[in-house]
Amino acid sequence: MCGICCSVNFSAEHFSQDLREDLLYNLKQRGPNSSKQLFKSDVNYQCLFSGHVLHLRGVLTTQPVEDERGNVFLWNGEIFSGIKVEAEENDTQILFNYLSSCKNESEILSLFSEVQGPWSFIYYQASSHYLWFGRDFFGRRSLLWHFSNLGKSFCLSSVGTQTSGLANQWQEVPASGLFRIDLKSTAISRCIILQLYPWKYISRENIIEENVNSLSQISADLPAFVSVVANEAKLYLEKPVVPLNMMLPQAALETHCSNISNVPPTRETLQVFLTDVHIKEVIQQFIDVLSVAVKKRVLCLPRGENLTANEVSKMCDRKANVAILFSGGIDSMVIATLADRHIPLDEPIDLLNVAFIAEEKTMPTSFNKERNKQKNKCEISSEEFSKDDAAADDDSPDKHVSVPDRITGRAGLKELKAVSPSRIWNFVEINVSMEELQKLRRTRICHLIQPLDTVLDDSIGCAVWFASRGIGWLVAQDGVKSYQSSAKVVLTGIGADEQLAGYSRHRVRFQSHGLEGLNKEIMMELGRISSRNLGRDDRVIGDHGKEARFPFLDENVVSFLNSLPIWEKANLTLPRGIGEKLLLRLAAVELGLTASALLPKRAMQFGSRIAKMEKNNEKASDKCGRLQIISLENLSIEKETKL
């Protein structure tokens, strides 16, 4: 992962050959292993390229990279499939070599259509004065744009800065395809024209209508001197996943559990589905494709190849290379179980579990209430929860921490130990006080969440920032010790709910509009995931010099799930804890998981209790006053107090 930036100016007298201090600092946070800036000047324009690399594969390749013809490339991505990259090779250099050999725009589009994995990039094509940029189909890597001074300058960057309330603030580059700017003609006209090369399905006949709608939506958010137009050659990128299967059953579906609609969910209920040969086959196919996705994401990183045999034998001294955002819920449990298959057994796995602690919270009453509430919801026996959790609570660095995700996290840890007892599972208890939340939101997190600005963005953005930072406590047999995760790769379960009808709104839509309405809701979820979640989470996790990886959004996983009819993925006639994400729950049972396979969806902001920390009367969609733009006078203070 990297922090990449390109600042372009069409007015020489006002151009600085350096970035603002705060922007440079934010970029370096993302790429701590190397930094470099490159200045390119033409009669009509000046470009400053800035690259900051987090080294995760092959030979450390400093960015930006430049070839003998003056082409410049900045890459923030991972090639997991599509283009062959050997273990010792760096994908930045491999992709740049291919890109430099492209003879026309069609070849550039064909190249990026082949890449599977998360990416954003900036490419300066010197001979034609073109600047290309874009994000992958799902928008798994952040890229922002900022247009200022009535067309005199613009900037592209992985992360922005706080702009003190000025108009035309940073905005996310839409994950709509590739964009191209002709810098030479822009310098003359002072009107920035963005040519769009959109994603499309090759067989779709309505691509022109879709493209027109996309252009108008993008243009609506841009200044008057910036316009978005379809590329003149009508060329397109090929979408990397198959279309969503919108098929509806010709007759009423017969459920295997028609008599359980009002029965509390149990593991035995799920076992009934596993007697069906076809369902069992689909589950195994799902496990296989998801397992490969996890494997790519946990093995594609540098490990301690130079360790001595004596060092390797000291398992307790080994550092984790992979961490998982871990609530103990079904998504993180399945990811952890599959990661265990592929990560070397002598390597620990960090399970990052975050809880927000209100000062007034007291201990046993709230703990018992939460435990009983969870038990009632999921029909998990008190014996299954209480023995391990009570012991953990006795030794916890903060005995008052009994938020729902901590309780399910500890129970999930117990399950993982049963599935893989030889693995060292580092359950990292990350406890955040009101004071720490408010201080670091103000000085550090606020600008990472922006340009998103809702109460929901604030809650999830802050929770993910503290969780991925990985500073907390380990509760072990020999006592409690402070701990900071050194893992550079952070796995997250984003994408499971969107594809498998995991949200409560899916059940509401199904109840009002049936399977057809549910299909449309899922299509909408996947279509907007880049603008709702992924750019924000990439900025937040990347701020720690770590890389977010999303197994559920692997192109092959999405294509497999898209190919299935909706009733093989979810059955919302069944109760919570079974019907939503049914396919994933059945996969969890096949993988040997127990109580976690029945946990109903609980949003991170509620499970971690961040939603209860401040105002309780806010709606998730409200604009969040706590994210209001402030000046970065705190930057030097933040540097001094950074933990």
Curated annotation (Swiss-Prot):
One Pfam family here: Asn_synthase
Active site: 2
Membrane spanning stretches: none
An individual GO BP term: asparagine biosynthetic process
Compositionally biased residues, Basic and acidic residues: 367-390
Domain Glutamine amidotransferase type-2: 2-184
PROSITE patterns to which the protein is assigned, alphabetical: GATASE_TYPE_2
Domain Asparagine synthetase: 285-601
InterPro entries in UniProt: Asn_synthase, Asn_synthetase_domain, GATase_2_dom, Ntn_hydrolases_N, Rossmann-like_a/b/a_fold
Keywords of this entry: Amino-acid biosynthesis, Asparagine biosynthesis, Glutamine amidotransferase
MF annotations from Gene Ontology: asparagine synthase (glutamine-hydrolyzing) activity
Keyword Amino-acid biosynthesis tagged: yes
Location of region: Disordered: 367-404
PANTHER family found in the cross-reference section: ASPARAGINE SYNTHETASE DOMAIN-CONTAINING PROTEIN 1
Protein name: Asparagine synthetase domain-containing protein 1
